């Protein structure tokens, strides 16, 4: 396959060949250029608060151990014994000073160093250099306000720079709210879909909500219920979409703090969020304070998505070109009353948990998109994401990134696939940066500040 062929994904992200959702050769290329190169979500501070705490996570198809060190730092290692390649840790989470392989008993410290080998002197003599046999370490581990990401590529930009313009929109909730927590362990389910299908949807697709989720909207009586069955468009000025250089993007639905949740939760959620408004107005200004109380439908490129006010946090772990393991956490504000946290966690399970009704609505879409990508006639067709193209702006006086000032559009789709195509066709971060020099002119007209 010619990965520099612009017909695979157009430079502006306007079109993508359907086969990208089902081609196994391309999937192997993604492991090399997407998952081995970009920042991938690992865990949250709240899940490993103390020295020795660890979780097992995934980076692409590889499993890693993420461990809090004695000095408070966080490191991550491949979950593979260096002796014969066996999986080292099978637990999802725990606290340990080290890890012992159940095959031959080799023991590794929480710092990844090989510390003990049964009968080392008797069997190996001086032939084994333990200093060279530690666990393979993930090159970069950094935090975005408590959310821990890892990257295998030393040449990647810092996590802060990688978040880029998207970070400006996320910080009101992730930082200025007082901080967030993830409630784990995550719910896990396998869907027969390519990882990009849900990732693109969560990057800000408000277009499907009224139709795909019609029955869920009617039964739940959320603040978005008026959209059910495409009975109406969101009113003018109801939201915006944005995207950024490295592919992260989102849709913003103004003042949607109670999210997708049903009427019984709305008064308490609105009261809790509203109590912070005066402080946030003073600290970060009225625009970003409004972003805090608005519903963000976001994907951090490539495979981490969340709905801020709905408390839904997902990672789309690829298994193969047509199979994805979905991890779902509940995301809550640290200072929420414990009873409200509990009720929000329950609501996340009802809506977007492994058997949630909103989740079930989406899965049929994701799976058939991916299944059709393998069929002979349909795989070479072009998928389009041109909704709102030509109306996006770069250089807005208020809102950073490429911005489409409508609740419904495909601005964030285009940014996601522009970055995706640039990575697939590049052999390194340096080449990606070179082909991305004009990323904003490919996606939007530029305004003078």
UniProtKB/Swiss-Prot annotation:
Its EC number is 1.14.12.12. It is an enzyme of class 1 (oxidoreductase). It catalyses: naphthalene + NADH + O2 + H(+) = (1R,2S)-1,2-dihydronaphthalene-1,2-diol + NAD(+). Pathway: Aromatic compound metabolism; naphthalene degradation. InterPro entries: RHO_NdoB-like_C, Rieske_2Fe-2S, Rieske_2Fe-2S_sf, Ring-hydroxy_dOase_2Fe2S_BS, Ring_hydroxy_dOase_asu_C_dom, Rng_hydr_dOase-A. This is Naphthalene 1,2-dioxygenase system, large oxygenase component. Fe cation binds at residues 208, 213, 362. The gene is ndoB. One of its GO terms (molecular function) is naphthalene 1,2-dioxygenase activity. [2Fe-2S] cluster binds at residues 81, 83, 101, 104. Belongs to the bacterial ring-hydroxylating dioxygenase alpha subunit family. Keywords: 2Fe-2S, Aromatic hydrocarbons catabolism, Dioxygenase, Iron, Iron-sulfur, Metal-binding, NAD, Oxidoreductase. Binds 1 [2Fe-2S] cluster per subunit. Its cofactor is [2Fe-2S] cluster; Fe(2+). It holds the Pfam family Rieske. The naphthalene dioxygenase (NDO) multicomponent enzyme system is composed of an electron transfer component and a dioxygenase component (iron sulfur protein (ISP)). The electron transfer component is composed of a ferredoxin reductase (NdoR) and a ferredoxin (NdoA), and the dioxygenase component is formed of a heterohexamer (trimer of heterodimers) of three large alpha subunits (NdoB) and three small beta subunits (NdoC). GO terms for biological process: catabolic process. It comes from the Bacteria. Residues 39-137 form the Rieske domain. Component of the naphthalene dioxygenase (NDO) multicomponent enzyme system which catalyzes the incorporation of both atoms of molecular oxygen into naphthalene to form cis-(1R,2S)-dihydroxy-1,2-dihydronaphthalene. The alpha subunit has a catalytic role in the holoenzyme.
């Amino acid at each position: 396959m010619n990965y520099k062929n612009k017909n695979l994904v157009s430079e502006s992200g306007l079109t993508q060949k359907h086969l990208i959702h089902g081609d196994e050769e391309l999937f192997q290329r993604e492991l090399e250029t997407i998952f081995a190169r970009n920042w991938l979500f690992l865990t949250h501070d709240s899940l490993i608060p103390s020295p020795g705490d660890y979780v097992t996570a995934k980076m692409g198809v590889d499993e890693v151990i993420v461990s809090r060190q004695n000095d408070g730092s966080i490191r991550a290692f491949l979950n593979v014994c260096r002796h014969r390649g066996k999986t080292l840790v099978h637990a999802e989470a725990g606290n340990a000073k080290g890890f012992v392989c159940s095959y031959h008993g080799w023991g590794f410290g929480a710092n990844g160093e090989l510390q003990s080998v049964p009968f080392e002197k008797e069997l190996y003599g001086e032939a084994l250099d333990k200093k060279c046999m530690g666990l393979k370490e993930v090159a970069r581990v950094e935090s975005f306000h408590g959310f821990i990401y890892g990257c295998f590529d030393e040449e990647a930009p810092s996590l802060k720079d990688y978040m880029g313009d998207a970070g400006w929109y996320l910080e009101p909730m992730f930082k200025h709210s007082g901080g967030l927590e993830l409630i784990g362990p995550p719910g896990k389910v396998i869907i027969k879909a390519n990882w990009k299908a849900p990732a693109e949807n969560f990057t800000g697709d408000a277009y499907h909500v009224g139709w795909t989720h019609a029955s869920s909207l009617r039964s739940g009586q959320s603040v978005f219920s008026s959209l059910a069955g495409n009975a109406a468009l969101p009113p003018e000025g109801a939201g915006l979409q944005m995207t950024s250089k490295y592919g992260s993007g989102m849709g913003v639905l103004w003042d949607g703090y109670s999210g997708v949740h049903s009427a019984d939760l709305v008064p308490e959620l609105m009261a809790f969020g509203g109590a912070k408004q005066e402080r946030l107005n003073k600290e970060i200004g009225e625009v970003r304070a409004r972003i805090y109380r608005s519903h963000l439908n976001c994907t951090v490129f490539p495979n981490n998505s969340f709905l801020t006010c709905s408390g839904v946090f997902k990672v789309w772990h690829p298994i193969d070109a047509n199979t994805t393991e979905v991890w779902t956490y509940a995301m809550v504000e640290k200072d929420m009353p414990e009873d409200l946290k509990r009720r929000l966690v329950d609501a996340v399970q009802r809506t977007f948990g492994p058997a949630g009704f909103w989740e079930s609505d989406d899965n049929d879409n994701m799976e058939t998109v991916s299944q059709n990508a393998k069929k002979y006639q349909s795989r070479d067709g072009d998928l389009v994401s041109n909704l709102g193209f030509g109306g996006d702006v770069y250089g807005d006086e208020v809102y950073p990134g490429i911005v489409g000032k409508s609740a419904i559009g495909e601005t964030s789709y285009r940014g996601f696939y522009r970055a995706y195509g640039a990575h697939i066709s590049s052999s390194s971060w340096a080449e990606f940066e070179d082909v991305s020099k004009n990323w904003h002119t490919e996606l939007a007209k530029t305004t003078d500040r």
